[in-house]
């Protein structure tokens, strides 16, 4: 099993969610976050004054999937989140040793 973590622009979330459902993902965790990479920050104007905003709003999506669909899920996220502009985000894959469904006590693949 693998944990797939994606950091994407907030306005792409609906497209990514639909794409993940089409890829067979049954559930996900979504968190609103802030950060910066090469994009750095941006400037905004408020009441005529320009302000530098160091952190950019992003969305973190986390899904645990079976090894057999990892590439399909990663490709689905990338396709749905790509705008071609700087700041589109990142996707990474981490190993998951075990998973337990709290309600039933099921473990491993049965808990997915």
UniProtKB/Swiss-Prot annotation:
In nitrogen-limiting conditions, when the ratio of Gln to 2-ketoglutarate decreases, P-II is uridylylated to P-II-UMP. P-II-UMP allows the deadenylation of glutamine synthetase (GS), thus activating the enzyme. Conversely, in nitrogen excess P-II is deuridylated and promotes the adenylation of GS. P-II indirectly controls the transcription of the GS gene (glnA). P-II prevents NR-II-catalyzed conversion of NR-I to NR-I-phosphate, the transcriptional activator of glnA. When P-II is uridylylated to P-II-UMP, these events are reversed. The modification O-UMP-tyrosine is found at residue 51. The lineage of its organism: Bacteria, Bacillati, Actinomycetota, Actinomycetes, Mycobacteriales. One of its GO terms (molecular function) is ADP binding. Signal peptide: none annotated. It holds the Pfam family P-II. Belongs to the P(II) protein family. InterPro entries: N-reg_PII, N-reg_PII-like_a/b, N-reg_PII/ATP_PRibTrfase_C, N-reg_PII_CS, N-reg_PII_urydylation_site. The keyword Nucleotide-binding applies. PANTHER family: NITROGEN REGULATORY PROTEIN P-II, NITROGEN REGULATORY PROTEIN P-II HOMOLOG. Keywords: Nucleotide-binding, Phosphoprotein, Transcription, Transcription regulation. Homotrimer. One of its GO terms (cellular component) is plasma membrane. This is Nitrogen regulatory protein P-II. It comes from the Bacteria. One of its GO terms (biological process) is biological process involved in interaction with host.
């Amino acid at each position: 099993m693998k944990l797939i973590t994606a950091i994407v622009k907030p306005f792409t979330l609906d497209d990514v969610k639909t794409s993940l459902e089409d890829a067979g993902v049954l559930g996900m965790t979504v968190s609103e976050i802030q950060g910066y990479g090469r994009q750095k920050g941006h400037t905004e104007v408020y009441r005529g004054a320009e302000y530098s905003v160091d952190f950019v709003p992003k969305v973190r999506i986390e899904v645990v999937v079976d090894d057999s669909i990892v590439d399909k899920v990663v490709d689905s996220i990338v396709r749905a989140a790509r705008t071609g502009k700087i700041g589109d985000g990142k996707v990474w894959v981490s190993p998951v040793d075990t998973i337990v469904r709290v309600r039933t006590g099921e473990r491993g693949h049965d808990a997915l």
